[in-house]
Curated annotation (Swiss-Prot):
NCBIfam families: PRK05327.1, rpsD_bact
Domain of life: Bacteria
Molecular-function GO terms, alphabetical: rRNA binding; structural constituent of ribosome
Protein name from the UniProt record: Small ribosomal subunit protein uS4
Annotated organism of origin: Actinobacillus succinogenes (strain ATCC 55618 / DSM 22257 / CCUG 43843 / 130Z)
Quaternary structure annotation from Swiss-Prot or TrEMBL: Part of the 30S ribosomal subunit. Contacts protein S5. The interaction surface between S4 and S5 is involved in control of translational fidelity.
Coiled coil segments of this chain: none
Described purpose of this protein according to its UniProt entry: One of the primary rRNA binding proteins, it binds directly to 16S rRNA where it nucleates assembly of the body of the 30S subunit. With S5 and S12 plays an important role in translational accuracy.
Domain S4 RNA-binding as annotated: residue spans: 96-156
HAMAP family, A to Z: Ribosomal_uS4_B (MF_01306_B)
């Protein structure tokens, strides 16, 4: 399955919530009717079955992190192998992706932009260039903008935008140096309450 290249707001409308696929310069509800699904019959909200609700939640989380189905299923399998709560393990694995950490640190306005920075070798981890978006960042890893990429206008703009947002407590960021430290593994209380990971576990457990 190819990566989705269509209108980003359409996906947020489909899920009925902001998937943070746009930069956030303007509130998403000023751009579209977030509570109305796209299409001719978008105003109608059909009652979902249990399976439908589970599928929608999986699609929502998959789209938030920009991950294809096969890769998402592999993350679930890994989360299920780990000790502890499978749903929480899944979210921790997704949060530990390098492209997500770059986004969370404010070096990119969206996860898609962060993925591009990583792929274009603009990111270093512990002083070494890493160009794999799915690379798992570990505790105490230092993630930084590569020296030759620090003058990019979009990175500076993203950092300015990030100053207006609440910073994740599990990361430590030095905006002036354009680097940050992955201080600790995020806890469930640190992450979005709008995600019902238990529905994803129920879906894949069948």
């Amino acid at each position: 399955m190819a990566r989705y290249l269509g209108p980003k707001l359409k996906l947020s409308r489909r899920e009925g919530t902001d998937l943070f696929l746009k930069s956030g310069v303007r509130a998403i509800d000023s751009k579209c009717k977030i509570d109305t699904a796209p299409g001719q019959h978008g105003a109608r909200k059909p009652r979902l079955s249990d399976y439908g609700s589970q599928l929608r939640e999986k699609q929502k989380v998959r789209r938030i992190y920009g991950i294809l189905e096969r890769q998402f299923r592999n993350y679930y399998k890994e989360a299920n192998r780990l000790k502890g709560n499978t749903g929480e393990n899944l979210l921790v694995l997704l949060e530990g992706r390098l492209d997500n950490v770059v986004y969370r640190m404010g070096f990119a306005a969206t996860r898609a932009e962060a993925r591009q920075l990583v792929s274009h070798k603009a990111i270093v981890v512990n002083g070494r260039v890493v160009n794999i978006p799915s690379f798992q960042v570990s505790v105490d890893d230092v993630v930084a903008i590569r020296e030759k990429s620090k003058k990019q206008a979009r990175i500076k703009a993203s950092l300015e935008l990030a100053e207006q947002k609440e910073k994740p407590t599990w990361l430590e960021v030095d905006s002036a140096k354009m680097e940050g430290v992955f201080k600790r593994v995020p806890e469930r209380s640190d992450l979005s309450a709008d995600i019902n990971e238990h529905l994803i576990v129920e879906l894949y457990s069948k």
